[in-house]
Amino acid sequence: MKHYSIQPANLEFNAEGTPVSRDFDDVYFSNDNGLEETRYVFLGGNHLEARFPEHPHPLFVVAESGFGTGLNFLTLWQAFDQFREAHPQAQLQRLHFISFEKFPLTRADLALAHQHWPELAPWAEQLQAQWPLPLPGCHRLLLDEGRITLDLWFGDINELTSQLDDSLNQKVDAWFLDGFAPAKNPDMWTQNLFNAMARLARPGSTLATFTSAGFVRRGLQEAGFTMQKRKGFGRKREMLCGVMEQTLPLPCSTPWFNRTGSNKQEAAIIGGGIASALLSLALLRRGWQVTLYCADEAPALGASGNRQGALYPLLSKHDEALNRFFSNAFTFARRFYDLLPVKFDHDWCGVTQLGWDEKSQHKIAQMLSMDLPAELAVAVEANAVEQITGVATNCSGITYPQGGWLCPAELTRNVLKLAQQQGLQIHYQYQLQDLSRKDDGWLLNFAGDQQATHSVVVLANGHQISRFSQTSSLPVYSVAGQVSHIPTTPELAELKQVLCYDGYLTPQNTANQHHCIGASYHRGSEETAYSDEDQQQNRQRLIDCFPHAQWAKEVDVSGKEARCGVRCATRDHLPMVGNVPDYDATLVEYASLAEKKDEAVSAPVYDDLFMFAALGSRGLCSAPLCAEILAAQMSEEPIPMDASTLAALNPNRLWVRKLLKGKAVKAG
């Protein structure tokens, strides 16, 4: 069985208050002066104080083996802040730290360890506040208003480095080779790790490590680093430093899922919903010039315009990519929304998904068998449902304690206002008719004979994504649906959590004393007119799922208050994020892919044309992480996702999977 929970660190604190691993019988940092040792070994060993002012790029990337208590990261963050204060006009503006940890500390142990260094408290408190759940894979933390990016990879570093996407190759400017001593933890210090470090190292990259062990020096030399010894810290005689002085050949392991970015830093986004808004912020943070073209007279008039939407992950025992993506997307979304400096109605009240019939009960039982962290999802018996939700249902289920609801329309509008303050240009009532490649950019033709030219274009226009020649073959479909707005009653007012069944019901929004109930589902439809039949169906599904609940029968839809929208979806329930694939070229280039994988060229795509679509009914959960993934890809920065899960988001995936099996592919 695949487990989706990571074992926490098994540690104790010694007489000096230093954390000690029980499993490895080694300290996390020196009893004497761990802070000064970090500054000497890792910051000094990589010459960071001298390199920061001369760095020719806006981003500096550091990778580390063994996050532990985060001492190395916090010390580096402090030094980077001091550099930025002393050199405000320097080219280098942002720091990206990538670290691997097999046994992450609990938040409580982390906070206890941080008491050792009061001078690091301002940085440590931010880290503790965002400390992720013990889930495998990459957890991206945006710190210091996005100037600091921390990618925490939970799992075995030798396994994780083999699962990294090729976009991480040659991105690292400095390596901190840390961890428990080689004699205590020999499984980490392998040639496989040294080779991975070399693969990820940018030409000119450096490394430093506290050990001077001969097999470590020889292994790093074999991987491609030029190594030398340096005086060790304190009583340690020697340590090792290295430089990547060569450019290593880097074969692409899965060229059919290759992702390309752009160095142009200027883009147009087509859309006006949550995807467009969050991507705008992510690109602006990276220094892009961004222009948004919205077909409507105001933002959030499409699928992002609902009053209340539920936030919780989509899980399935039989789909590892879906589980990995949505569990990490959900936790990222919560961190992101909590730090977002804009106002929007929301309540992290929890979400309870109920087993209202045999099929749904079986599905929930399968989800609960996946060894999920209790902070993410936990079983709830029928007799406890009323206590935690406030209403009687006579059903058991699964509760997502960190879930809840938010107002997508208000979120989208206010995020766009924030983006405008940061430089976003917005044009409303610009309906894109077609686009074509022109010189080194894209010519956009809008209704009313309006034109514009941009270096890079992102299509984030929901169900209208496939209306252009470049996207007409995409395997996406429209889903029309109606959400009913119902007045509260004394019984409904007791509802404390979002209920999910064969539909969903939100607690009341105290701003309007209404609940949302929905949604109807019409695959292939783009109808947005009010439907009395849908209104009645939304009510009836609630009654059918909870036939003994009197409060359900009292739901009143007679006011005919509702909102109709159209979503864009895929049959595998995952978003499509990345380069727009060239359908015709894909069929030609990959006609013999099943027999000639070794000869495959890089995925045929349209240069400088990207897409952010098919968020389906889980856009509030997936959009923040997808925006971060796409902005990182476009900016040629490290992407916070393992290769196989990232491939499951590739817009060409459904075609390529068939071609890899030698099956025929049809458009749409």
Swiss-Prot record:
Cofactor: FAD
Keyword terms of this UniProt record: Cytoplasm, FAD, Flavoprotein, Methyltransferase, Multifunctional enzyme, Oxidoreductase, S-adenosyl-L-methionine, Transferase, tRNA processing
Region (tRNA (mnm(5)s(2)U34)-methyltransferase): 1-245
Signal peptide: none
Enzyme Commission identifier(s): 2.1.1.61, 1.5.-.-
A Pfam family it matches: DAO
UniProt catalytic activity: 5-aminomethyl-2-thiouridine(34) in tRNA + S-adenosyl-L-methionine = 5-methylaminomethyl-2-thiouridine(34) in tRNA + S-adenosyl-L-homocysteine + H(+)
Main localisation: cytoplasm
One GO CC term, this protein: cytoplasm
Top-level taxon in the UniProt lineage: Bacteria
GO function term, MF aspect, one: tRNA (5-methylaminomethyl-2-thiouridylate)(34)-methyltransferase activity
Span list, region FAD-dependent cmnm(5)s(2)U34 oxidoreductase: 270-668
Subcellular location: Cytoplasm
BP GO annotations: methylation; tRNA wobble uridine modification
NCBIfam families: MnmC_Cterm, PRK01747.1-1, PRK01747.1-2, PRK01747.1-3, PRK01747.1-5, tRNA_MNMC2
Task performed by this protein: Catalyzes the last two steps in the biosynthesis of 5-methylaminomethyl-2-thiouridine (mnm(5)s(2)U) at the wobble position (U34) in tRNA. Catalyzes the FAD-dependent demodification of cmnm(5)s(2)U34 to nm(5)s(2)U34, followed by the transfer of a methyl group from S-adenosyl-L-methionine to nm(5)s(2)U34, to form mnm(5)s(2)U34.
UniProt cross-references to PANTHER family, sorted A to Z: SARCOSINE DEHYDROGENASE-RELATED, TRNA 5-METHYLAMINOMETHYL-2-THIOURIDINE BIOSYNTHESIS BIFUNCTIONAL PROTEIN MNMC
Family, similarity comment: In the N-terminal section; belongs to the methyltransferase superfamily. tRNA (mnm(5)s(2)U34)-methyltransferase family. In the C-terminal section; belongs to the DAO family.
Name the UniProt record assigns to this protein: tRNA 5-methylaminomethyl-2-thiouridine biosynthesis bifunctional protein MnmC
Organism: Escherichia coli O1:K1 / APEC
